[in-house]
From Swiss-Prot:
<dbReference type="InterPro" id="IPR029752">
    <property type="entry name" value="D-isomer_DH_CS1"/>
</dbReference>
<feature type="binding site">
    <location>
        <position position="294"/>
    </location>
    <ligand>
        <name>Zn(2+)</name>
    </ligand>
</feature>
<feature type="binding site">
    <location>
        <position position="217"/>
    </location>
    <ligand>
        <name>Zn(2+)</name>
    </ligand>
</feature>
<feature type="active site" description="Glycyl thioester intermediate">
    <location>
        <position position="241"/>
    </location>
</feature>
<feature type="binding site">
    <location>
        <position position="220"/>
    </location>
    <ligand>
        <name>Zn(2+)</name>
    </ligand>
</feature>
<dbReference type="GO" id="GO:0005524">
    <property type="term" value="F:ATP binding"/>
</dbReference>
<dbReference type="GO" id="GO:0005829">
    <property type="term" value="C:cytosol"/>
</dbReference>
<dbReference type="GO" id="GO:0046872">
    <property type="term" value="F:metal ion binding"/>
</dbReference>
<dbReference type="InterPro" id="IPR035985">
    <property type="entry name" value="Ubiquitin-activating_enz"/>
</dbReference>
<feature type="binding site">
    <location>
        <position position="96"/>
    </location>
    <ligand>
        <name>ATP</name>
    </ligand>
</feature>
<feature type="binding site">
    <location>
        <position position="119"/>
    </location>
    <ligand>
        <name>ATP</name>
    </ligand>
</feature>
<keyword id="KW-0479">Metal-binding</keyword>
<dbReference type="Pfam" id="PF00899">
    <property type="entry name" value="ThiF"/>
</dbReference>
<protein>
    <recommendedName>
        <fullName>Ubiquitin-like modifier-activating enzyme 5</fullName>
    </recommendedName>
</protein>
<feature type="binding site">
    <location>
        <position position="299"/>
    </location>
    <ligand>
        <name>Zn(2+)</name>
    </ligand>
</feature>
<keyword id="KW-0862">Zinc</keyword>
<dbReference type="InterPro" id="IPR045886">
    <property type="entry name" value="ThiF/MoeB/HesA"/>
</dbReference>
Length: 393
């Protein structure tokens, strides 16, 4: 028989679910079968489709064919899932085993009436109301356990809309154990993924794109806690928690989704590593090469596979010099050769090949040579006589 505490806990969960149902309010909009660029108030995709009209994205409709797995539906993960949902992603798979608490309310997305619900269920209900066109699967379990790890691998390898592997995995977890589990799974499955994180003091964060065998995985250069194999749970103290700013988490989530869209829709450049320091507004970027002696055997195997693949050399695009667009004009403007700056614009300046001046260098008119065109004429006067003449001027 259940204890009083268990029954009270169950009552709270049922009350939370009832509050969530009541909060849904009016009916959801009807599903939209085809994305349209028509600019009307009732079209939620018109501004997204404008990216296609402006030449940023070739085919935005492809996003409805994509499947993304979000692991961790906390401060970063919930906002990431919301952004992807609003962008019209085809399918979203959510993983988390935690429950919504009132302490989560500073992290955006979740609402007080959802306290007590599992994060994935609360997120799925809210996201489905935002965009009913998105297929959402929610998995409420810890991926780091042996049994659940295999379930996780099966889901990301067969959970797409077509029954194959997902297009991208986004790690939004807050511990190294879960990151290592995602890293292991993606290395084994040759699955591309993004790792993200926010510092404990909430004023810095990062995202990292990981392509097994091509870029450094999470085990190639692990944090000290991972490298020394310390149990993270022993580092946590009662009554002490990490700081959390919704601004920092929103920024990191924005970077994460922005680069995910660039990868999925093939536009722009995907950043391999992007950091963020809120105190100095510093955004470092870099590329990380895989470690040949990585502890992860699957990572080393993927590196060997990439090494044996024939390199594809891209032919250089040859463009024809068409000259100035408007050679003749009504304003008397003439165009000089870009690689031949006029000599009079930069007297005495020697430029190496490929270097141009951005402006003309002014001649110093204060020197006698510049004003008279030669040296000052010799004078028989002494220094005292010259000073006396200057005083009388």
């Amino acid at each position: 028989m259940a204890s009083v505490d268990e029954l009270q806990k169950k009552i709270k969960e049922l009350e939370a679910k009832l509050a969530a149902v009541e909060a849904k309010g009016g009916p959801m909009r009807q599903k939209i079968e085809v994305m349209s660029s028509e600019v009307v108030d009732s079209n939620p995709y018109s501004r997204l489709m404008a990216l296609k009209r402006m030449g940023i994205v070739n085919n935005y409709e492809q996003i409805r064919e994509k499947t993304v797995a979000v692991v961790g539906v906390g401060g970063v993960g919930s906002v990431t899932a919301e952004m992807l949902t609003r962008c019209g992603i085809g399918k979203l798979i959510l993983f988390d085993y935690d429950k919504v608490e009132l302490a989560n309310m500073n992290r955006l997305f979740f609402q007080p009436h959802q306290a007590g619900l599992s994060k994935v269920d609360a997120a799925a209900a809210t996201l489905q109301n935002i965009n009913p066109d998105v297929t959402i699967d929610a998995y409420n379990y810890n991926i780091t356990t042996v049994d659940n790890f295999q379930k996780f691998c099966d889901t990301i390898s067969k959970g797409s809309l077509t029954g194959g592997a997902v297009d991208l995995v986004l790690s939004c977890v807050d511990n190294f154990e879960a990151r290592m589990a995602i890293n292991t799974a993606c290395n084994e499955l040759d699955q591309k993924w993004f790792e993200s994180g926010v510092s404990e003091n909430a004023v810095s964060g990062h995202i990292q794109f990981i392509s097994p065998g091509e870029s450094a995985c999470f085990a190639c250069a692990p944090p000290l806690v991972v490298a020394t194999k310390v149990d993270e749970r022993t580092l946590k103290r009662e009554g002490v928690c990490a700081a959390s700013l919704p601004t920092t988490m929103g920024i990191v989530a924005g970077f994460l989704v922005q680069n995910s869209l660039k990868y999925l829709l093939e536009f722009g450049n995907v950043t391999h590593y992007l950091g963020y320091s809120a105190l100095t507004d510093f955004f470092p970027t870099m590329s990380l090469q895989p470690n040949p002696t990585c502890d992860d055997a699957s990572c080393r195997a993927r590196q060997e596979q990439r090494r044996l693949q024939p390199r594809v050399e891209l032919a250089a695009e040859v463009t024809e010099d068409c000259g100035p667009v408007h050679q003749d004009n009504d304003w008397g403007i003439s165009v000089l050769e870009e690689n031949s700056p006029a000599d009079e614009d930069c007297p005495g300046l020697k430029l190496v090949d490929g270097v141009q001046v951005a402006y003309s260098i002014p001649v110093d008119s204060s020197t006698p040579e510049s004003s008279t065109g030669g040296a000052v004429a010799a004078s028989e006067l002494s220094l005292e006589d010259l000073m006396q003449q200057m005083k009388t001027m």
